[in-house]
Design a protein with these regions (language model features):
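Short, surface-exposed ligand- or partner-binding patches at beta-edge/loop junctions that are enriched
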Residues: 70
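Conserved G/P- and acidic residue-centered "switch" motifs that form tight phosphate/ATP-binding loops
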Residues: 25, 74
């Protein structure tokens, strides 16, 4: 049986706040600006041509942290997680309920979990992970 690499929004928040987890929001920039992002999330647009290299850099430089990915409803991250697994990037957790919620759960924002302006999150990221 396959390993369950999913995590709830509440558990992701707890691990993020304790410093055990890096949360990567893989939505598009217009989505980040529209809704805000999970407080403390790193922003890596999965449609960026360099997304794979950026995500690999996150994994390589943070071997002692769990990495979780989040999108709007969990559909993109579910697909992305399977692609990552097929390419040897295993162990990435999927926040299946996403930011807005959907069939997999209530969602980060509807749960009232902390969010921040996307520009603040972007400014706090390591500069070499920011798309040019």
């Amino acid at each position: 049986m396959a390993e369950d690499n999913t995590i709830t929004a509440q558990d992701a928040l707890a691990k993020l706040e304790s410093g055990e987890l890096i949360l990567v929001d893989v939505r598009r920039p217009d989505e980040w600006l529209s809704t805000g992002v999970a407080k403390g999330a790193w922003l890596l647009d999965m449609t960026d041509e360099n997304f794979g290299a950026y995500l690999n850099a996150v994994l390589q430089r943070n071997p002692d942290h769990q990495i979780a990915i989040i999108c709007r409803t969990g559909n993109r991250t579910g697909y992305l997680q399977s692609v990552l697994d097929e390419n040897g990037m295993t162990g990435v957790l999927d926040v299946t309920e996403g930011m807005a919620g959907g069939p997999n759960g209530t969602g980060w924002i509807p749960r009232g979990l902390p969010i921040q302006d996307a520009r603040e999150a972007y400014d706090a990221m390591p500069k070499d992970l920011i798309a040019k």
